Amino acid sequence: MNWLTNVVRPKIRNILRRETPENLWIKCPDSGQLVFYKDVEANQFVIPGSNYHMRMGATARLKSMFDNETWFDVALPEVTPDPLKFRDERRYADRIKDARARTGMNDAVKVGFGKLEGMGVVIAVQDFDFMGGSLGMAAGEAIVRGLELAVEKTSPFIVFAASGGARMQEGILSLMQMPRTTVAVQMLREAKLPYIVVQTNPTTGGVTASYAMLGDVHIAEPGALIGFAGARVIEQTIREKLPEGFQRAEYLLDHGMVDMVVHRHDLRPTLARLCRLLTKSPAVEHPKPAPQLPPPAKTVEAADAPAVAPTA
């Protein structure tokens, strides 16, 4: 009995054991309900029921925007990974390596070129999972390159902003990306091409103070945090209590800071419609299905026809 208990049973358990993924379930920050990860992923990372918009990765975002989930990844300029040899509790170079291994991205911004309901567009997406989507030299170069490509292709440029601000580990070099991206936006404007900004949760700091507030149209996702400094910092500075919902998308819409708040499921058709309106392009006409005609009547050969008695 001891042999069965001590030897055989543990081996059987090891054979039958299955590792449970860490992200099998997601807890909704709004309602607290546990939701199966695959269900959230299939719903574009919107929690069913509460409609809470989770953060969405760059690749998933591009996949949800482009026709047939296909696009061309835009080659981005390489930059010095650690120009200041910065170190706090850890080396900045090590933080970059960890972020790249975790996200599969080179830096916080991914740029793609493809079709949005038949129209060529350039889309840049900030991924908050990569060091908080912070704006550094590489991210700035990516935004500038995306704007340059939009001018080359005479295409609209759409950016999905998600950032905590400038990347402190790069000092003044990260702050320089604010005027650089602003100049690049002006280049797009001089080419008379549309620039649409989608502000996701969160859009703060130096990103808000530069290209994220320079669009022809500003769209926000429901519940997105949008602002420059944090609410607690503002309260401590002005020594006043801020109104409820301050810096949230709906509050900014009520006060004229954004043009519309759009559910994630409606973003794709909304962006396509805006691009067509701003470029004065005709609407895409989808072919109508051919009408269902009744089957032709069966013809009867003379030899197969039944004999009919002559009438008197």
From Swiss-Prot:
GO molecular function, one term: acetyl-CoA carboxylase activity
Protein's cellular compartments: Cytoplasm
Pathway: Lipid metabolism; malonyl-CoA biosynthesis; malonyl-CoA from acetyl-CoA: step 1/1
Entry keyword annotation includes Mitochondrion: no
Family annotation (SUPFAM superfamilies): ClpP/crotonase
Enzyme Commission identifier(s): 2.1.3.15
Catalytic activity: N(6)-carboxybiotinyl-L-lysyl-[protein] + acetyl-CoA = N(6)-biotinyl-L-lysyl-[protein] + malonyl-CoA
InterPro entries per record: AcCoA_carboxyl_beta (IPR034733), Acetyl_CoA_COase_Trfase_b_su (IPR000438), ClpP/crotonase-like_dom_sf (IPR029045), COA_CT_N (IPR011762)
Coiled coil segments of this chain: none
Top-tier EC class: transferase
The UniProt record lists the keyword Cytoplasm: yes
GO biological process: fatty acid biosynthetic process; malonyl-CoA biosynthetic process
Domain CoA carboxyltransferase N-terminal per the UniProt entry, residue ranges: 24-293
UniProt-annotated stretches for the region Disordered: 283-312
Biased composition (Low complexity): 298-312
Family matches, as NCBIfam families: accD
Family: Belongs to the AccD/PCCB family.
Subunit structure: Acetyl-CoA carboxylase is a heterohexamer composed of biotin carboxyl carrier protein (AccB), biotin carboxylase (AccC) and two subunits each of ACCase subunit alpha (AccA) and ACCase subunit beta (AccD).
Annotated function: Component of the acetyl coenzyme A carboxylase (ACC) complex. Biotin carboxylase (BC) catalyzes the carboxylation of biotin on its carrier protein (BCCP) and then the CO(2) group is transferred by the transcarboxylase to acetyl-CoA to form malonyl-CoA.
Protein name, per record: Acetyl-coenzyme A carboxylase carboxyl transferase subunit beta
Species whose genome carries this gene: Bradyrhizobium sp. (strain BTAi1 / ATCC BAA-1182)
